Amino acid sequence: VRNTMDAKADIGIAYDGDTDRVLMCDGKGRIIDGDIMLWVIGRWLKSKGTLGSGVVATVMSNMVLEDLLAKEDIKVFRCGVGDRYVLDTMRKENSRLGGEQSGHLIALDYANTGDGLCSGLLFLRALSDLDEDISTLSDRFDRYPQVLKNLRIENKDRVLGSIKLKEAEENALNKLKGKG
């Protein structure tokens, strides 16, 4: 971020160690994460007629992604965290784009796994073709308050397999539907 701002560049691009994730920042140093990239690339793929049934996002993605894509008549399919869950849901729902807030994106027409270089290039192409200004994306992607918390569980399989937990989760999801 600092290098982008010091260089007075419009955009900064960063990859993780094995280059399967990409994050960016605009010239003001605001982070462009996977949620924003899914929003932009999803709209672009829809405009080209190659999106498929919608966009796959994990439960960690901010609800504003779902709301903004809904305004474009793009459905969001939610899945568990991890690229294997994203890919499984993409195949199940016939989606061509999916990913995580962390910048781990999969665009099946270009690669069958997360590829940060490919995702970064797709995002830049989408920005160009949609005539988007990267400096306005963060303002328009006005995130809802969100708390992400990891919990350590000793007997994960037993706890996650609990019928009471599944019922509580289903009840909570039904109450929150469309609200968070």
Task: Give the predicted meaning of each segment.
Residues Y15-G17, I31-I36, A111-G114:
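Short glycine/threonine-rich catalytic loop with a Thr-x-Gly-x-Asp
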